[in-house]
Each structure stands twice: as structure tokens, then as C-alpha cells.
Curated annotation (Swiss-Prot):
Job description of the protein: Specifically methylates the pseudouridine at position 1915 (m3Psi1915) in 23S rRNA.
Quaternary data: Homodimer.
Similarity annotation: Belongs to the RNA methyltransferase RlmH family.
Catalysed reactions, semicolon-separated: pseudouridine(1915) in 23S rRNA + S-adenosyl-L-methionine = N(3)-methylpseudouridine(1915) in 23S rRNA + S-adenosyl-L-homocysteine + H(+)
InterPro entries in UniProt: Alpha/beta_knot_MTases, RlmH-like, tRNA_m1G_MTases_N
Entry's Gene Ontology molecular function annotations: rRNA (pseudouridine-N3-)-methyltransferase activity
Gene Ontology cellular component annotations, sorted alphabetically: cytoplasm
Subcellular location: Cytoplasm
Pfam families the UniProt entry points to: SPOUT_MTase
Residues annotated as binding S-adenosyl-L-methionine: 73, 104, 123-128
Native species: Aliivibrio fischeri (strain ATCC 700601 / ES114) (Vibrio fischeri)
Protein name: Ribosomal RNA large subunit methyltransferase H
EC number: 2.1.1.177
Top-rank EC class of the record's enzyme: transferase
Length: 156
């Protein structure tokens, strides 16, 4: 199973790139973590945010391979602790589909992305900076994998 993070935003700070790479490289070959960056729409004083969200959503969904399970990151989504995320990872493996996790931009996700989702996950009730979410996602998914693989990374 491949896990794909589809995230709005490019040109992240170096610490984000390094943090993401640190965890993504740890994944086993049979469960690679891939990042697909979607160019954010231009935001300005008179920007049409609905139109920007629509365009970003279209680009995100176009980046998802046909047949993938789509999981959106959204504050009203289901909250999973680390063990529950590990259980989700196991369930996703049994589903025999690759997984695409959609991370929206500053205004969140387009309605089309939410409508296409098989699941919605709330990473936190807090509003987190989107660059930080990439690093947190990579670490959280790696930790969940380590639980399923009985790897010593996760300690209770």
C-alpha cells in the first residue's frame, strides 16, 4: 500500500522539507509515503476565495490516482489517537487500495474534495499551520506503522 499526501502549497521552509523527509525515508518499501504538492492559488485583498478553493480542489483530485481511498484532513473529521491510527492503517492495508490524504490550504478544502472523501480525519481541534501539518502527518503515520510492525519507535 502506498500513502500519498496531497497538500496545497509549494516552496516550504527548509525545516519543513527536512522534517518531512526524515520520516518519509523511514517508511518500508512496501508502504512508501509520497508527497504531491499542489500550487496554491494567488490570494490577495480582492481574491475570489471560493474560486481559488475550487481550482485547488480540482488539482488535488486530479492528483489522486483512480481507485485510491481518499481521506481528508478536516477539523470536523473523526479524531484518532495513535493506536486508533494504527488500526486505521491496518484496515487500509486490508482494503487493498492505496491511500491519498488531502491537506488543504489556508482556507481548508474545496467542497468537491470533502464530497469525494471516503473518510475525514481531524488531526487536531487546533488550527495548525499547513507546513507543520506535513511534518506531523509524516511522523504520525510512521509512528502508526511502527505499532503495526512491532517496531521499537513507539513507546507507551
Amino acid at each position: 500500500m502506498k500513502i500519498q499526501l496531497v497538500a496545497v502549497g509549494t516552496k516550504m521552509p527548509k525545516w519543513v522539507e527536512e522534517g518531512y523527509k526524515e520520516y518519509s525515508r523511514r517508511f518500508p518499501k512496501d508502504m512508501p509515503l509520497e508527497l504531491v504538492e499542489i500550487t496554491a492559488g494567488k490570494r490577495g485583498k480582492n481574491a475570489d476565495i471560493a474560486r481559488i478553493l475550487q481550482k485547488e480542489g480540482e488539482a488535488m483530485l486530479a492528483a489522486v490516482p483512480k481507485g485510491n481511498r481518499i481521506v481528508t484532513l478536516d477539523i470536523p473529521g473523526k479524531r484518532w489517537d495513535t493506536e486508533q491510527l494504527a488500526e486505521q492503517l491496518e484496515a487500509w492495508k486490508l482494503d487493498a487500495r492505496d491511500v491519498s490524504i488531502l491537506i488543504g490550504g489556508p482556507e481548508g478544502l474545496a467542497p468537491a474534495c470533502k464530497a469525494a472523501a471516503d473518510q475525514s480525519w481531524s488531526l487536531s481541534p487546533l488550527t495548525l499551520p499547513h507546513p507543520l501539518v506535513r511534518v506531523v502527518m509524516a511522523e504520525s503515520l510512521y509512528r502508526a506503522w511502527s505499532i503495526t510492525a512491532n517496531h521499537p519507535y513507539h513507546r507507551e
